[in-house]
Amino acid sequence: MTTGGSDMDGTRSSGRHTGGERHAGTSPGTGPGVEVRPVAGHIGAEITGVDLADEPGDAVIAAIRAAVLRWKVVFFRGQRLDHAGHVALARRFGEPVVLPRRGKASPSGFPEIETTADRLELGGRFGMEHDEWLRRRRHTLLRGWHCDHGARIDPPAATILRAQTVPPYGGDTTWSNLAAAYAGLSAPVREFTDRLRAEHRLGVGYLPRSGDDAYVRHLLDHQTASEHPLVRVHPETGQRVLFVNGYYVEQITGLSRPESRAILEMLLEQATRPEYTVRFRWEQGSVAFWDNRATIHLAPGDTAHLDHPRIMHRVMLAGEVPVGTDGRASEPITGTAPGRW
C-alpha cells in the first residue's frame, strides 16, 4: 500500500523482522480531536475526530497509515463519503484497483468501486435460485476466512469498505491479525513453516450440486491460481505473516494431501484464535480500512435468512507480489499476472 514510492508509514523496512509487535507508532496529536483508540489486544482501532469526506490533511493521512500498519484494521463511524469521495480517499493511500467485471449493483462511472449486495445481485446467477445460492454460501468455505483475491499473484495491499445500508442486527465482520498469529507459534513450528509454500486457487472448498453445475463450470473456465510462501514478509513493517486462509489455500507444495490437510488445519486454527481477532458492528456510514497483507477476515453468515438488505461498497488498493522469508517471490500458476485484473 504505497504512494509515490514511499511505504505506507513513509519509511523503508529492512525486512529482517521475524514477527511479533514491531509497528509504526500512532499519534493522537496529529490534528484537533483526532484520536486512535485500540479496541482489541492484537488488532483493531477506532479513529475519531476525522471527516474522511473533508480531504484530510497530510498529517492525518500519515496517522491513518501508521494506525493501519500498527493495528491491521481501523474503523471510522458516522462518515458521509459518497462514491467520488471514497475513490479520492483511497488514492491518498495507493492506486485503486479497477475491476474489469463487477456485479450489476456496482455504481456506473466508478470502476474502482465494487458493491456487495446479496439481495440485489445474487438471485438467479448461474442458473441458481437466490435461496440456493445463499444456502451454498452458508455451508461452504465461500463464507470462510479469507483475504481479498488471495489466489492472485499480487493480492490487493488493502481494502477500504464503506457501509451504505446495514441490517438492524447481525452482519458483523471479523478480522484476524496474521502477524500476531505467526508470532504465537512455537519456534520449531515457525522454523518449519518458514520453508513451506502453498497453492492458492479460486474456488477451493466450493460445494458443487449434482448434475449440471453452471457455477463450477464458470470456476473451471476462469481459473486463477498462484504458489505463495506460507509465511510472507510484510513489505513495509518487515513482520512475518502467516499467509493462510480457509478459502484459497488448496495444498502445501511437496506434501501429501493428508499431510497438507493436517498442517493447514492446525495453522488456520492458530490464525483464527479469538485473541488475534476483532469483530466490528456496522452502522450506516461506517468505514473499515484494513491491511490485506496481514489479515484475513470473515464475512457475516448470519443475515441470509433475514429480510434486511446489506449494501457495502469497497475499493481495493493494488498490491505487490508476496515474498517469503527466503527472499523468493510468489509464482503464478494460471490466470494471473502482476497488475492484470
Over which residues does each language-model region extend?
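Fe(II)/2-oxoglutarate oxygenase catalytic core
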Residues: 2-289, 293-341
